[in-house]
């Protein structure tokens, strides 16, 4: 049985620019505050996924979409959708070595999220998603 519709949902299209990636992080933080959810690790995951959309999912004239949703009790789902469905991220070991200056975004997402993955479509899109658990405000 599919999860019921999320009780809380935020969705926004953003430009595929560094400014758009920064705005994704800032808007996510404000939305999490308004929902009284912890900022981290969600804010860090949004930053990494948005940066990847800008660096690897850029198509001139197209945007990327950030979605935040509470999908189950105490689970936040983060989705970033871009229009480069032909460029899927690969779950690979760290091949850059200890001195690499980039290439660790999805490794970081994998460490911070309870689970993450990629969904293809609708053409020409792909969505990279991550889920993180949190302690509800009433229990903090």
Feature annotation, model-predicted:
Residues 37-61:
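Conserved ATP-binding N-box helix of the HATPase_c
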Residues 1-11, 54-140:
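Conserved beta-strand-loop-beta-strand hairpin that lines the nucleotide-binding pocket
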């Amino acid at each position: 049985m599919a999860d019921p519709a999320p009780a809380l949902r935020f969705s926004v299209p953003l430009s595929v620019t560094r400014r758009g990636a920064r705005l994704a992080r800032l808007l996510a933080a404000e939305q999490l505050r308004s929902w009284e959810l912890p900022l981290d690790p969600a804010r860090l995951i949004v930053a990494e996924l948005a940066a990847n959309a800008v660096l690897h999912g850029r198509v001139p004239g197209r945007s990327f979409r950030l979605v935040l949703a509470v999908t189950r009790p105490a689970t936040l789902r983060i989705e970033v959708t871009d229009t480069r469905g032909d460029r899927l991220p690969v779950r690979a070991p760290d091949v850059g070595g200890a001195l690499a200056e980039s290439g660790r975004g999805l490794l970081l997402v994998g460490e911070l999220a309870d689970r993450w993955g990629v969904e293809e479509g609708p053409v020409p899109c792909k969505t990279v998603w991550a889920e993180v658990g949190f302690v509800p405000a009433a229990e903090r």
